[in-house]
């Protein structure tokens, strides 16, 4: 399962402001480029709604219908298999059961919290949009346990293995990323 964040380490207020048409177009292009590097470009990219119930016909906000739906339609017109917006509380159970391999979360905790709840420390942070493969462990720096001989190396090994597996197809990801202004 690959989870992409339209916004990352910003406040929720800032994330809502940052979810805009250009950002959504760019993230969908980057996810598509990444899926092509994995030779899985035909798999759908599931986009999570920003608001509860993906806005529920604009009852809970207009961002889903005004920003996300048009971005998904533009992606489809460009040949990208994007679907949504799907309410996050529906999207995640479907993803865990295998329906989706590529997800776009609108903000950090919408993507990170459920991923960590299901997969724990078995995640790898992949930075898409750079000319080189850049990965890191998904759990942070762990400064609180540094020097205590209790850190586990499994996450680092997983990150290194993922970097090696991605390196061969990375040029296609970078080519697509360099055409956008980034996210």
Language-model regions, residue ranges each:
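Anion-binding alpha/beta catalytic cores of soluble intermediary-metabolism enzymes, centered on
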Residues: 1-63, 69-183
